[in-house]
Amino acid sequence: MSKVHVFDHPLIQHKLSYIRDARTGTKEFRELVDEVGMLMAYEVTRDLELQDVEIQTPVTKMTAKRLAGKKLAIVPILRAGLGMTDGVLSLVPAARVGHIGLYRDPETLEAVEYFAKMPQDIDERQIIVVDPMLATGASAIEAISSLKKRGAKSIRFMCLIAAPEGVEKMQEAHPDVDIYIAALDEKLNDKAYITPGLGDAGDRLFGTK
């Protein structure tokens, strides 16, 4: 069964309070999501494999540590996932970036893929799928299934807030994928919105309705 990591770091919780606040404008909301994405990425990448390299400092030669082999790929779920991508990239600027777009079928309510563009060596990289919200879990489950079909073997999912219902469905569908969240909220309401939540992350990021 996948592990659920809930971050209680004071800086993350402080910034998340402003992200949730309905009075927070688009510019500040976007900046805060970016910042929290960076802070979360620090912990998500904590156990990346390192290798020894020989370097020359201004004083002497030494053995240092660098990331081993192929490194990271960040895959935002369009469009809200874009808001977290730059924050992760500020920490690991050499990471490759894929994109996956999904929409909800109005009849079946299932997530349907309409766009996907991935690095060619996706099977050799540690994948971090990013999306601000894990509500029903449908989009995240479909995105991860799509990545696995393309050969991805090592995947993690990172979001700002999640509902227990979405976490449960993710664990059932992908028990090998660890979930990293800034807050686990109470529930989904009758419109499948996370409660208390933060509203529609995409609309708040891009100033749309």
From Swiss-Prot:
| Binding-site residues, uracil | I194, G199, D200, A201
Q: Which positions does UniProt annotate for 5-phospho-alpha-D-ribose 1-diphosphate binding?
A: R79, R104, D131, P132, M133, L134, A135, T136, G137, A138, S139, D200
An MF annotation (GO) of this entry:
GTP binding
Q: Name one GO biological process term.
A: UMP salvage
Which reaction is this enzyme known to catalyze?
UMP + diphosphate = 5-phospho-alpha-D-ribose 1-diphosphate + uracil
Q: Which HAMAP family match?
A: Upp_B
Functional description taken from the UniProt entry: Catalyzes the conversion of uracil and 5-phospho-alpha-D-ribose 1-diphosphate (PRPP) to UMP and diphosphate.
This chain belongs to which protein, by name?
Uracil phosphoribosyltransferase
Please name the gene that encodes this protein: upp
